[in-house]
């Protein structure tokens, strides 16, 4: 049978699912994915993005690669898992709102902390071309609100220009990025071998002849797992407090800068000799070694919060995710289905955990 529980959000309009096939009082292997997808607004799709279309050996739809293909392969294996007697349990963890900051998984973590035993390892099925990924970067995202004072643009010294102040912060973030690009730290196993800082949005001002009273920008840091990201954030906060705010508040003490954390999740760095790495590689017949990726996943959260060793491995390519005509190939799904079948055999035989 399947022992399952739904963990709803505050509105009860969406939920996480945690299910166990086998016994709930012994450690097992967790298969995890997120059920939400990114919007299709403004994208030039050639098929209905919310109707699955099979063409030329590929399946087209929003979320086909990221990451409903993996979830479909997992669910397709459930009848076989329930039919056979598993010596090692299988756990299925499906989350909501991963795409907007890994929000749903936090509630799932709360449930899992109450379980009698934790999974001994986890496979998160983000699209990796069925390659074994043992490490990924972490991410912190922020919204900065600059509160200035408006005035007629003919008398700019009577106001505090919020856009001008925000541009100073953008310049400082760019300076930090340039310093990291030159001095590191580096890890050449990543496509982008260093921590990156990126200003993605900025809005400010109401008219050309008005000194802008408000400016809002958003930036992110995608950091190597081993890098002290808190120090980077402290540098930015320190620059705001010591360089940017004093001249503003000399004109008007009610002006200032607020910084809000939008998203924060840790990086993943699973050792090459971890049991989960060896198991997944052996089931795939993988002799090419492991990978590291610059995008993030919930794997880092499961490891960081619960201590569950994890890898990322799933069908499809991240290059197809989040764009028009997203697809996953039939060949990739076949590889994932074969992996699930071999995993089931291993669960029936029993997996010896170190």
Where are the predicted features?
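Acidic/His- and Gly-rich active-site-bordering loop/insert found
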Residues: 1-60, 83-86, 307, 317
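Hydrophobic/aromatic beta-strand patches that form the interior of the parallel beta-sheet core
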Residues: 5, 29-31, 93, 123, ...
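Metal-dependent amide/peptide-bond hydrolase catalytic core
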Residues: 143-354
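Fold-level recognition of mixed alpha/beta catalytic cores in primary-metabolism enzymes, strongest
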Residues: 56-59, 64-65, 69-175, 193, ...
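Acidic-glycine-rich active-site phosphate/pyrophosphate-binding loop
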Residues: 40-54, 119, 134-145, 279, ...
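Glycine-rich phosphate-binding loop signature in dinucleotide/nucleotide-binding domains
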Residues: 24, 114-118, 306
């Amino acid at each position: 049978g399947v022992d399952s529980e739904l963990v709803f959000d505050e509105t009860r309009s969406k939920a996480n699912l945690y299910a166990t096939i086998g016994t709930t009082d012994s450690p097992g292997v967790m298969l995890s994915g997120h059920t939400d997808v990114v919007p299709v607004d403004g994208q030039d799709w050639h098929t209905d993005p919310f109707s699955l279309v099979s063409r030329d050996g590929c399946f087209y739809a929003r979320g086909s690669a990221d990451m409903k293909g993996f979830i479909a392969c997992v669910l397709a294996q459930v009848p076989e898992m329930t039919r056979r007697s598993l010596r090692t349990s299988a756990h299925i963890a499906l989350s909501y709102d991963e795409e907007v900051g890994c929000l749903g998984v936090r509630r799932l973590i709360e449930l899992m902390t109450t379980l009698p035993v934790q999974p001994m390892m986890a496979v998160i099925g983000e699209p990796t071309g069925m390659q074994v990924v043992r490490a990924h970067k972490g991410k912190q995202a922020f919204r900065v609100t600059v509160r200035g004072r408006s005035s007629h643009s003919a008398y700019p010294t009577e106001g505090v220009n919020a856009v001008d102040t925000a541009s100073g912060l953008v310049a400082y973030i760019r300076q930090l990025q340039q310093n990291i690009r030159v001095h590191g730290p580096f890890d050449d196993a990543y496509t982008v071998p260093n921590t990156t800082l990126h200003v993605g949005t900025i809005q400010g001002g109401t008219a050309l002849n008005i000194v802008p009273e408000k400016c809002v920008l958003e930036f992110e840091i995608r950091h190597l797992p081993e890098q002290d990201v808190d120090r980077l954030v402290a540098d930015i906060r320190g620059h705001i407090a010591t360089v940017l705010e004093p001249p503003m508040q000399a004109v008007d003490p009610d002006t200032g800068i607020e910084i809000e954390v939008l998203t924060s999740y840790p990086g993943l760095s699973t050792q090459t000799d971890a049991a989960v790495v060896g198991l997944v590689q052996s089931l795939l017949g993988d002799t090419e070694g492991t990978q590291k990726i610059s995008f993030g996943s919930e794997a880092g959260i499961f490891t960081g919060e619960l201590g569950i060793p994890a890898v990322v491995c799933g069908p499809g390519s991240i290059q197809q995710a989040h764009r028009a005509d997203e697809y996953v190939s039939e060949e990739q799904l076949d590889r994932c289905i074969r992996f699930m079948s071999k995993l089931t055999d291993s669960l029936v035989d029993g997996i010896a955990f170190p």
